[in-house]
Curated annotation (Swiss-Prot):
Any one Gene Ontology molecular-function term assigned to this protein's record: metal ion binding
Record-given protein name: Hydroxyacylglutathione hydrolase
Catalytic reaction(s) noted: an S-(2-hydroxyacyl)glutathione + H2O = a 2-hydroxy carboxylate + glutathione + H(+)
Species of provenance: Escherichia fergusonii (strain ATCC 35469 / DSM 13698 / CCUG 18766 / IAM 14443 / JCM 21226 / LMG 7866 / NBRC 102419 / NCTC 12128 / CDC 0568-73)
Pathway entry: Secondary metabolite metabolism; methylglyoxal degradation; (R)-lactate from methylglyoxal: step 2/2
Lineage of origin: Bacteria, Pseudomonadati, Pseudomonadota, Gammaproteobacteria, Enterobacterales
Keywords: Hydrolase, Metal-binding, Zinc
Length: 251
């Protein structure tokens, strides 16, 4: 299996998995044009689309792709039923695509119906988990997003986290504002800064590394707890997550 990223809009990535025969899976095609160009250039045969949630920058290209390739099966959560989804999937179910079984994981927070797809080592997490950050809470609660991130963080160490946006540099600037002396965060920030200066992608990331540099996955970390305690005493990790998310919203 080959993993490919297709840039779209200002900072989106549309992920494509293809096998040796050229069959491919497309994840969150917000725009059809760059996908159609990649399909033509690589001689791919699209078999399926995965949708993580209903936002337009993730679903906008579905109808055009299905019109061009009517055999495509479109998997998505209930909230994408009017966006072109032909196979609604929910937490605990599986999608069998390209000979691989993908587990569906409910991750409410960014939207209430947001889902992720996992088939070792690939995690397609939409706008739930970003490198160094997490999605804004447009519909869900901090507690829901905390639980969603906890699920994803429990996946195997070698999981390849395929996020839908290039937000890594701004996320790491925020992380540095919270933990300015953290060695892992500083090292990763320098690496990301160099990559982005060359206009290079920072994704996918390995989950084991992400747990070290993503403050939203470190709500039980003593260094982070000490920083938060300087401002307010919060006993529960969900409360610390909410504090972080509120800070990031204003950053």
């Amino acid at each position: 299996m080959n993993l490919n990223s297709i840039p779209a809009f200002d900072d989106n990535y549309i992920w494509v998995l293809n096998d040796e025969a050229g069959r491919c899976l497309i994840v969150d095609p917000g725009d059809a044009e760059p996908v159609l160009n990649a399909i033509a250039a690589n001689n791919w045969q699209p078999e399926a689309i995965f949708l993580t949630h209903h936002h337009h920058d993730h679903v906008g290209g579905v109808k055009e792709l299905v019109k061009k390739f009517p055999q495509i099966v479109v998997y998505g959560p209930q909230e994408t039923q009017d966006k072109g989804t032909t196979q609604v999937v929910k937490d605990g179910e599986t999608a069998f695509v390209l000979g691989h079984e993908f587990s569906v994981i409910a991750t409410p927070g960014h939207t209430l119906g947001h889902i992720c797809y996992f088939s070792k080592p690939y995690l397609f997490c939409g706008d739930t988990l970003f490198s160094g950050g997490c999605g804004r809470l447009f519909e869900g609660t901090p507690s829901q997003m905390y639980q969603s991130l906890k699920k994803l963080s429990a996946l195997p160490d070698d999981t390849l986290v395929c996020c839908a946006h290039e937000y890594t540099l701004s996320n790491m600037k925020f992380a540095l504002s919270i933990l300015p002396h953290d060695l892992s965060i500083n090292d990763y920030y320098r690496k990301v800064k160099e990559l982005r200066a060359k206009n290079q992608i920072t994704l996918p990331v390995i989950l084991k590394n992400e747990r070290q540099i993503n403050v939203f996955l470190r709500t039980e970390d003593i260094d982070l707890i000490n920083v938060i305690n300087e401002e307010t005493l919060l006993q529960q990790p969900e409360e610390r997550f909410a504090w972080l998310r509120s800070k990031k919203d204003r950053f």
